């Protein structure tokens, strides 16, 4: 394994460890500070908008200065965010800190770190190993997040967890320092800005946005809020439940490699994702916390098989010089779309039903599966990825 990949995996480990507890703690912390369902939903939307802005902003610096400088800068913002969380009890400053630190409020990432890291991995390994490395990348992230989620049940208070966040942000910056001084794609002149795969990238971005919009209704933070509000599930129990969910998600990432090798990237993405969202809709009808959590676990066992396959697919259908643009555009679309739905979710929970977001989110995500397959089933890969 190359030094580039090792550094990226180390950074992913410490970052997602903190995301594992922050995704649970922040909505509960904001609730303790006086925000209701609509306020928490709006706060999550602002966090995602902050991630979208950072995702949009990193493309040009990455193309000009390389991955190391860009990623170290992003890690520096996480350090500032952790310090701000430690220093304030004002809800709007807590939200600002989460925006600056690109704090993930779901079980996965769609922001600037993912954008840059998947490009580094794509350039560091050949197409024949790309799906495997990206599966390992995501596997490490979910396993680390599972361990982080367990801290919610044993931590003496939110402040202790924010100190852990600060420490992991510093370690993340140090890991990025191990990257070569400049990892960037082939230089493009001002007259060579047109992307041959531009229409393809835009179609992918539009469909990924639909999927992400649906996913925004059922982010981990909002699912935790749902379980806490409807079934009175305590924070310690939520920590264990989501830790198990992260482990099951990690297993789904392991399954992605043999399935993609046998059936291809696109069929693997679509079928696994479709089945997982049928289970998601079923959570809305769960009569007890145990059944709801059980269905959540089944979904997590299937839901992320499409993640490394999707990342490998995006890198495989564009030219090397288009990879920053493809990663940035598709991840930006996902983040922006996901930013809209949490605010709607808060309103839907109050005005319609607490469980309605599961039906809305699952239905939209199933529509995405059908459209994705019909749109891209005849598109050929540019390299030898499978």
Task: For every predicted segment, state its role.
Residues 48-56, 145-146, 246-254, 335-339:
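Residue-level signature of mid-helix packing/kink "hotspots" within the transmembrane helices
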Residues 53-66, 252-265, 349-350:
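Helix-to-loop junctions at the C-terminal end of transmembrane segments
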Residues 53-89:
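Conserved MFS/SLC helix-loop-helix module at the cytosolic interface between two early adjacent transmembrane helices
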Residues 69-84, 267-282, 362:
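Structural signature of the two symmetry-related core transmembrane helices
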Residues 132-153, 333-341:
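Glycine-rich segments within core transmembrane alpha-helices of 12-TM secondary carriers
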Residues 148, 166-186, 368-376:
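C-terminal membrane-cytosol helix-exit motif in multi-pass small-molecule transporters
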């Amino acid at each position: 394994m190359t030094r580039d990949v090792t550094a990226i995996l180390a950074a992913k480990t410490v970052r997602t460890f903190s995301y594992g507890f922050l995704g649970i703690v922040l909505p509960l912390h904001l609730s303790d500070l006086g925000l209701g369902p609509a306020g928490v939903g709006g706060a999550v939307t602002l966090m995602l908008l902050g991630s979208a802005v950072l995702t949009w902003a990193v493309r040009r610096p990455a193309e000009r200065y390389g991955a190391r400088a860009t990623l170290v800068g992003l890690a520096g913002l996480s350090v500032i965010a952790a310090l701000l969380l430690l220093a304030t009890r004002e809800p709007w400053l807590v939200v600002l800190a989460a925006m600056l630190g690109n704090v993930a409020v779901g079980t996965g990432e769609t922001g600037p770190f993912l954008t840059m890291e998947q490009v580094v991995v794509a350039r560091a390994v050949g197409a024949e190993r790309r799906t495997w490395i990206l599966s390992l990348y995501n596997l490490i992230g979910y396993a680390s997040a599972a361990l982080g989620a367990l801290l919610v049940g044993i931590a003496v208070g939110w402040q202790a967890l924010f100190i852990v966040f600060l420490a992991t942000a510093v370690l993340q910056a140090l890991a990025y320092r191990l990257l070569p001084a400049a990892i960037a794609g082939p230089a493009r002149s001002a007259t060579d800005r047109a992307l041959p795969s531009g229409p393809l990238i835009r179609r992918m971005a539009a469909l990924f946005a639909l999927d992400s919009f649906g996913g925004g209704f059922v982010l981990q933070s909002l699912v935790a809020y749902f379980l806490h509000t409807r079934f009175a599930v305590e924070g310690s129990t939520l920590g264990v439940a989501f830790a198990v969910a992260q482990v099951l998600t990690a297993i789904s990432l392991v399954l992605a490699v043999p399935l993609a090798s046998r059936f291809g990237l696109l069929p693997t993405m679509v079928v696994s994702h479709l089945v997982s969202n049928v289970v998601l809709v079923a959570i809305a009808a769960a009569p007890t916390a145990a059944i709801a959590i059980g269905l959540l676990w089944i979904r997590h066992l299937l839901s992320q098989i499409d993640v490394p396959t999707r990342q490998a697919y995006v890198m495989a259908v564009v030219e090397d010089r288009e990879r920053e643009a493809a990663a940035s555009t598709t991840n930006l679309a996902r983040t922006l779309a996901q930013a809209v739905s949490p605010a709607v979710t808060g309103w839907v929970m109050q005005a319609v039903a607490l469980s309605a977001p599961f039906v809305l989110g699952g239905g939209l995500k199933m529509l995405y599966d059908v459209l994705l397959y019909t749109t891209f089933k005849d598109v050929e890969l540019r390299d030898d990825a499978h």
